[in-house]
Amino acid sequence: MILSWKDVLSQEKKKKYFINIIRFLKKERLKKIIYPDQKDIFNAFFLTSFNDIKVVILGQDPYFSKNQAHGLSFSVPKHVTIPPSLKNIYKELNTDFKKEHIFHHGCLESWANQGVFLLNSILTVESGKPKSHSNIGWNIFTDKVISVINLYKNSVVFLFWGSNAQKKSHLINRKNHYILKAAHPSPLSAYRGFFGCKHFSLTNKILLKTKKKPINWFLI
């Protein structure tokens, strides 16, 4: 069965809480700087079709500094300096595959185009104020997103880095999907279990086992 995001989420966008989120953002943008730009909030959904999802990497909320957030977890536009967490992701990627690849930018759109759904739990943030939009209803929406992936997809690999992401584990049926957990790649926690997790090679092994094309993580 081929499903689109519209098929599985159209009713959600009609619900009162979702309408309230959109109204709130419209008002906030009149007086404050909100990231990402309105056009980029749902980029993860535009770049990875529901039918193509093979992997989910769950982030927290968007980057809260100018020009960084563009709707994909951990990713930044090509012209922006690579943030510390993403540098650590690249470091683990090289270690995992025993490479010394030089990454010239932090845009992960090529991952998204290969079926890696780069979702944040919270989809917007006020400039300079991390987690400022954590209570406006986004968690209801992203819980629903994870739930429909769990319900309608098979053998998806969920990469949950850090305790916030791991709280979503209860939404997933482990009989039908795979969950890989590690510490968050932030410099504050990467040495507590993110480095050495080998999630990228493990993910590809699972994809091969389930007869899916592995991700070319170095295609950036």
Swiss-Prot record:
Query: What coarse category fits the chief subcellular location reported for this protein?
Result: cytoplasm
EC annotation?
3.2.2.27
InterPro entries hit by this protein: UDG_fam1, Ura-DNA_Glyclase_AS, Uracil-DNA_glycosylase-like, Uracil-DNA_glycosylase-like_sf
| Localization terms from the record | Cytoplasm
Q: Which domain of life is it from?
A: Bacteria
Alphabetically sorted, this entry's keywords are: Cytoplasm, DNA damage, DNA repair, Hydrolase
GO biological process annotation, one example: base-excision repair, AP site formation via deaminated base removal
Describe its function: Excises uracil residues from the DNA which can arise as a result of misincorporation of dUMP residues by DNA polymerase or due to deamination of cytosine.
What's this protein's family per the entry?
Belongs to the uracil-DNA glycosylase (UDG) superfamily. UNG family.
Q: What is this protein called?
A: Uracil-DNA glycosylase
Q: Which organism is it from?
A: Buchnera aphidicola subsp. Acyrthosiphon pisum (strain APS)
What's the encoding gene here? ung
